[in-house]
């Protein structure tokens, strides 16, 4: 029950946590291209290509995002077949074929640290696809068996000007019956939301039935990060019954998503960033997923069908979030969208810790200093538990001579030894597990803080000081992990022990080295937290032991006396 044994327990719990995380990633089937037994022409709608599964809710949604009746083979559009729209947060490239968003640059987020290139979340080309597709099926232009509609526009580039609140770009298409379809994209200042609106003018003498759909398409990927930095890349959705649930690429391969819900949303997630289609919260929407030619995964929604009377005009719209996982902003855009910042099963601890971290950062303006302040706060709040832990261990050490006498008295009779020890603990008012409970209670807090730092896009490219210019990646010179290992070594040296087993002694001696090795690849922000936690532990340990010395509960370790023969 000594301090070093508790340190070993903490280490084992932490390593077990990492191994469990790695096991979860390993047990999740990795996505690999499957052998195609039949080549499906990309020009046919999904309803034809997936005829083997007539219940698939993605029926009617086109498979090919780029294809039009005028250009059925191109995957890289010339500049004349795309337009751009930008506000102060986003720059979108929109294909005139179907009006899909084929590129999205996040202007406030660098691709790499201190680069002049913005982070590109959506992209198309070079063998990779991650796009936001939307259209009108039923009797709409996107259901044409000859391909997607080729829109016309007078706006080649629309940029939010100074003093403007929003910027829009309009695409026009007229079908063979003379029906007019206007697709408008609108960006507001300071927002990551794109409003996609349709104006449909029925020029015929017959009713026109159309159905709005929107989906996110991404090349199948097995990028799951590393053991210490596990990340999720795949789909997710929300319904009235399920607030938030991941739907991975392997889930989509096992079977399509099929949900009907009021409102809801569908999304594609990756580390720090998310794209999500958000339909009308009052419509009964169909959420679906699809695997396209064993190469791409799609997750999307279909709104209810709408009938437009002859010689009438109707409007439909949806919203698209393309941006970082900023909880406060996402919560305002759609219900439960902020849950894409996934803190795991300890979210109820991680959420307030993150809010506290935000509070400190708002005061000091430095995320590294905010981590130090939250460390002081957490360790201060846990000080009563820490003191109780050391008090229990000190009392256990004082009982060691009596426990030794009991073992000598009863010999190999373990039952009598255990009974006598329980009576001794009761008499001396000592809980033999008192040194373990506090450390077990502290571990969930560390894990919760681990996930809150891991999931926080705010720490991406956030500097601390000196050589630490990005708290979301490892220390480039490994200085923090080494200092953390040194601090663990001093904690060991200050902790009295009665461990006699040579194997346990060797394990304890190597724990600082093992932890240092693990932390070499940890984000600098996490290592900073652990280092400062150890520093505070050393201070608390010193103060507690001094108070124990006055009460006779602690004595400084003496060097062993070595007897030599003369």
UniProtKB/Swiss-Prot annotation:
It is found in: Cell inner membrane. Required for the insertion and/or proper folding and/or complex formation of integral membrane proteins into the membrane. Involved in integration of membrane proteins that insert both dependently and independently of the Sec translocase complex, as well as at least some lipoproteins. Aids folding of multispanning membrane proteins. InterPro entries: Membr_insert_YidC, Membr_insert_YidC_N, YidC/ALB3/OXA1/COX18, YidC/Oxa/ALB_C, YidC_ALB_C, YidC_periplasmic_sf. Signal peptide: none annotated. NCBIfam families: PRK01318.1-1, PRK01318.1-3, PRK01318.1-4, yidC_nterm, yidC_oxa1_cterm. GO terms for biological process: protein insertion into membrane; protein transport. The lineage of its organism: Bacteria, Pseudomonadati, Pseudomonadota, Gammaproteobacteria, Alteromonadales. Residues 31-41, 61-80 have a biased composition (Polar residues). This is Membrane protein insertase YidC. Belongs to the OXA1/ALB3/YidC family. Type 1 subfamily. Residues 30-80 are annotated as: Disordered. It is a multi-pass membrane protein. Pfam families: 60KD_IMP, YidC_periplas. The gene is yidC. Interacts with the Sec translocase complex via SecD. Specifically interacts with transmembrane segments of nascent integral membrane proteins during membrane integration. One of its GO terms (molecular function) is membrane insertase activity. Residues 42-58 have a biased composition (Low complexity). Keywords: Cell inner membrane, Cell membrane, Chaperone, Membrane, Protein transport, Transmembrane, Transmembrane helix, Transport. GO terms for cellular component: plasma membrane. The chain crosses the membrane at residues 6-26, 356-376, 433-453, 471-491, 510-530. It comes from Psychromonas ingrahamii (strain DSM 17664 / CCUG 51855 / 37).
């Amino acid at each position: 029950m000594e301090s070093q044994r508790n340190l070993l327990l903490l280490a084992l719990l932490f390593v077990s946590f990492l191994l469990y995380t790695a096991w979860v990633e390993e047990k999740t089937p990795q996505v690999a291209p499957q052998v195609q037994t039949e080549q499906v022409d990309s020009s046919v709608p999904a309803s034809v290509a997936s005829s083997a599964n007539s219940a698939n809710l993605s029926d009617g949604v086109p498979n090919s995002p780029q294809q039009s009746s005028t250009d059925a083979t191109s995957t890289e559009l010339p500049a004349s077949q795309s337009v751009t729209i930008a506000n102060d947060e986003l720059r979108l490239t929109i294909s005139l074929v179907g009006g899909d968003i084929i590129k999205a640059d996040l202007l406030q987020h660098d691709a790499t640290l201190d680069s002049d290139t913005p982070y590109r979340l959506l992209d198309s080309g070079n063998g990779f696809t991650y796009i936001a597709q939307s259209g009108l099926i039923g009797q709409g232009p996107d259901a044409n068996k000859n391909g997607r509609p080729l829109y016309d526009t007078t706006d080649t580039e629309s940029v939010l000007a100074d003093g403007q609140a929003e910027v829009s770009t309009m695409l026009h298409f007229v079908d063979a019956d003379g029906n007019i379809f206007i697709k408008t994209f609108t960006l507001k200042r300071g927002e990551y939301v794109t409003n996609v609106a349709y104006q449909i003018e029925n020029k015929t003498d017959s009713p026109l039935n159309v159905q709005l759909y929107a989906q996110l398409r991404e090349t199948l990927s097995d990028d799951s990060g590393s053991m210490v930095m596990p990340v999720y890349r795949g789909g997710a959705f929300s319904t009235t019954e399920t607030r938030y649930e991941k739907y991975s690429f392997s889930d989509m391969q096992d079977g399509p998503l099929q949900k009907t819900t009021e409102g809801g949303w569908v999304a594609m997630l990756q580390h720090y960033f998310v794209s999500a289609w958000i339909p009308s919260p009052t419509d009964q929407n169909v959420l679906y997923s699809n695997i396209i030619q064993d190469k791409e995964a799609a997750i999307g929604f279909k709104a209810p069908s709408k009938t437009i009377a002859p010689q009438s005009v109707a409007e439909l719209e949806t919203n698209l979030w393309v941006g970082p996982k900023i909880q406060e902003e996402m919560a305002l855009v759609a219900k439960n969208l902020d849950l894409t910042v996934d803190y795991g099963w300890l979210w109820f601890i991680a959420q307030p810790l993150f809010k506290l971290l935000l509070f400190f950062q708002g005061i000091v303006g430095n995320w590294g200093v905010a981590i130090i302040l939250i460390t002081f706060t957490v360790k201060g709040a846990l000080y009563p538990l820490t003191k109780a832990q050391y008090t229990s261990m000190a009392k256990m050490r004082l009982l060691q001579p009596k426990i030794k006498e009991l073992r000598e008295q009863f010999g190999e009779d373990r039952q009598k030894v255990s009974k006598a020890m329980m009576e001794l603990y009761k008499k001396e008012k000592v809980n033999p597990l008192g040194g373990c409970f506090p450390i077990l209670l502290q571990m969930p807090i560390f894990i919760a803080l681990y996930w809150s730092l891991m999931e926080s896009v705010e720490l991406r490219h956030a500097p601390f000081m000196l050589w630490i210019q990005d708290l979301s990646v490892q220390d480039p010179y490994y200085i923090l992990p080494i200092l953390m290992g040194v601090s663990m070594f001093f904690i060991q040296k200050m902790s009295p022990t009665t461990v006699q087993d040579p194997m346990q002694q060797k394990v304890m001696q190597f724990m600082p080295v093992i932890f240092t090795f693990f932390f070499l690849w940890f984000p600098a922000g996490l290592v900073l937290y652990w280092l400062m936690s150890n520093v505070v532990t050393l201070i608390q340990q010193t103060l507690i032991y001094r108070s124990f010395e006055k009460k006779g509960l602690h004595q400084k370790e003496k060097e062993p006396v070595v007897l030599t023969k003369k």
